[in-house]
């Protein structure tokens, strides 16, 4: 446990100062909602994974890139909430558009046989079939943070209710 705490503190020091409080807030949200945390050093910083403890399925990852800190969401339940997705700002919608299409959903080619299919969603009348690993890969920034937190809260609530 001490090693994980040390890794978490090292992760926070790599986060831009203006985003540390938000990263810490999300960390607490995940932990308080029954997620396990796995932190691994990478060449570009850290990969911080949050998994729903009972199902062991990933909910989110913090990922460092040259452009800064990104949050990858596995929004299996929130993806079905059309109102939530329609309220996304244009920058987040652009990130979804930019994500590669899911090869399994579009049947355009072979994907890894163990790969879970991506997300098929309709946002503002536009249909997307995106890879689950890049569909919801969003930059952490002041404009995006409230929307990211909203998606996470809905996803955690839906996963908890699905267990009940």
Regions picked out by a protein language model, each given a short descriptive name:
Residues 1-164:
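Charge-dense, helix-prone N-terminal extensions
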